[in-house]
Amino acid sequence: MFFYDSPKLPIFAGDKTCEMFVYRHKVHYYETDRMGVTHHSNYIRFMEEARVAWLDAIGASYARIEAEGVISPVIGVEGRFLHTTTFDDELEIEVCVKSMTSFKLKIGYTIRCKGEVVFEGWSLHCFLDKDGRPLAIDERYPQFREQLP
């Protein structure tokens, strides 16, 4: 079951409050390992699910961005596991823009379970044309920055 809303919350201690998008994910049995906890590799996938839902919600879906001739691959990702989660846990995945230039976008994620932070991370994306060459998003798709919360 997936659903989302958008309160304003800080993403990491010391960060400014920003428009926070919240995506919810219920942990499936197949996402757990032999020890009964959510396998660590799933957190990167949860980040992607939340990012795609967030882009859809702000009107800048990957399909729309790609129709403008822009691709945005992940060029970096990092995370910290703070607590385990298990089958049937309901996760709240908070998404927030950490920083942006014309060529890169850094997105922060905080994953909570029952109000407790269980994971913090970020993904870094660049902007390329369809031939894989760097491009300035402000020149190719200027409304993208305006759509960001």
Features from the language model and the residues they span:
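HotDog/MaoC-like acyl-thioester-processing domains
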Residues: 3-4, 12, 20-23, 56, ...
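Hydrophobic residues in beta-strands and at strand termini
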Residues: 25-29, 81, 127
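Residue-level recognition of specific faces of alpha-helices
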Residues: 43-46, 73, 108, 124
